[in-house]
Design a protein with these regions (language model features):
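A general structural motif
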Residues: 57, 67, 113-117, 144, ...
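Receiver (REC) domain switch-region micro-motif
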Residues: 32, 118, 242
Length: 255
């Protein structure tokens, strides 16, 4: 089975890391701790649906100088190794006693001087993807090093898209556009709404989506009360207003 090609060339990720490091320097930050799918994907290209399992934490440490360090469960070593990172540290997970805590702390100690600061996103639309008890253990193990908010560092860098990213986003939006154009093929009077949802997901996949994270929508006479409920088997009727929203992903980019 041939290996999948990297989503971007190495130079794209190197540029992202360089911009993060420049922003970190401006905030007197010695390293950056990333733990969420989007942030880790951004600096490594590590793309997997295995994130849907909550059983394992994953980390990437971005030092103020040099390349990022992946601190990940051993199950992800091969996939991460296909990317551009060279320093990949693993543990056998899940481990109820030490699920990456000591390995992460050791990595931080190597890259952050005593009294230094490691940033991690803490603001709106962020979270730390590890048990709070383990986060507290890491904090204690790396003291007197401080963990500070890196929301602005990460978000200001990520929100400025490269031409390569724009092309990926455009491609994913094109998939959604083509799928929406096919809605009249299956959204017909008498067709159950839950089947319309399934047909829409099928259309997204047929048009090139790698997967469909969700489909949101609703239908009702003159409007609808909410768009987050699961679809029912109620048939579409004359006078219904139908709304569909996509959750399509292609090469890690979403529409």
């Amino acid at each position: 089975m041939p290996e999948a090609k990297p989503i971007f060339p190495t130079v794209e990720y190197q540029g992202r890391v360089a911009r993060l490091q420049s922003a970190m320097q401006a905030q007197a930050m010695d390293a950056l701790l990333l733990s969420t799918p989007a942030d880790i994907f951004y600096v490594t290209g590590f793309l997997t649906r295995f994130w849907e399992s909550p059983a394992r934490p994953w980390f990437v440490v971005v030092p103020i100088d040099g390349e990022p360090v992946a601190v990940i469960p051993s199950i992800g070593a091969e996939l991460m190794g296909r990317g551009w990172l060279k320093d990949i540290r693993t543990w056998d997970a899940p481990d109820p006693v030490d699920d990456g805590v000591s390995l992460l702390a050791e990595t931080i100690l190597q890259h952050v001087p005593s009294g230094g600061a490691i940033g991690t996103p803490m603001g709106l639309e962020t979270h730390v993807r590890m048990p709070m008890a383990d986060f507290a253990r890491v904090t204690a193990l790396i003291a007197p090093r401080r963990i500070i908010d890196a929301t602005a560092v990460v978000q200001r860098v990520r929100e400025i898209k490269s031409e390569a990213e724009i092309a990926k986003i455009k491609a994913t939006c094109g998939i959604a556009d083509r799928a929406f154009a096919r809605v009249p093929e299956f959204a017909q009077i008498g067709r159950p709404l839950d089947q319309v949802f399934r047909d829409f997901q099928i259309a997204l996949l047929a048009e090139g989506a790698d997967w469909v994270s969700y489909v949101a929508g609703a239908a009702g006479q003159g409007g609808y009360g909410d768009v987050i409920s699961p679809a029912t088997d109620k048939p579409l009727a004359v006078g219904d207003i139908l709304m569909l929203d996509t959750g399509a992903v292609r090469d890690g980019y979403f529409c």
